[in-house]
Amino acid sequence: MGGTTDFVLSITIVLVILIIIAYIWYNFTGWSPFKYSKGNTVTFKTPDDSSIAYMRFKNCVFTFTDPKGSLHSIDVTNVLNNMAKGFRDAQNPPSSFTLGGHCQAPLNAFSFILPGVNDRATVATADDAKKWENCDATLTGLQRII
């Protein structure tokens, strides 16, 4: 083979190896599990006070029971990632954010909405809302700083 072909082949092999290493690094290292239960204030904080905009989430599931005892789950990975990314253009991005905003609402069956189950139209009255007070809720997943 010619010198140019050998060079191109070498560069291609090196690039493929670098892509494989980057894929392994991103997908299999540095992820920390989290779990919040009903009544917990859900706060995500960067360990080194860097911008929360660099936090990423994966495999995040919000699970709750309804008053009838049925179990419901929602994948909220994109919601949490978009909340963190929303701080990217902030003048002074914070190093943490709390689910529920300034209210710092504790985790409950209404922290994330599943249409037709725990939305405003389905839970229409105060009596309906009271039935939900004792329903369990959990938020689990993985987080990391990129």
UniProtKB/Swiss-Prot annotation:
GO terms for cellular component: host cell membrane; membrane; virion component. Its main location: host cell. Keywords: Host membrane, Membrane, Transmembrane, Transmembrane helix, Virion. It is a single-pass membrane protein. The chain crosses the membrane at residues 7-27. Induction: Expressed in the late phase of the viral replicative cycle. It is found in: Host membrane; Virion. Belongs to the asfivirus E146L family. This is Uncharacterized protein E146L. It comes from African swine fever virus (isolate Pig/Kenya/KEN-50/1950) (ASFV). The lineage of its organism: Viruses, Varidnaviria, Bamfordvirae, Nucleocytoviricota, Pokkesviricetes.
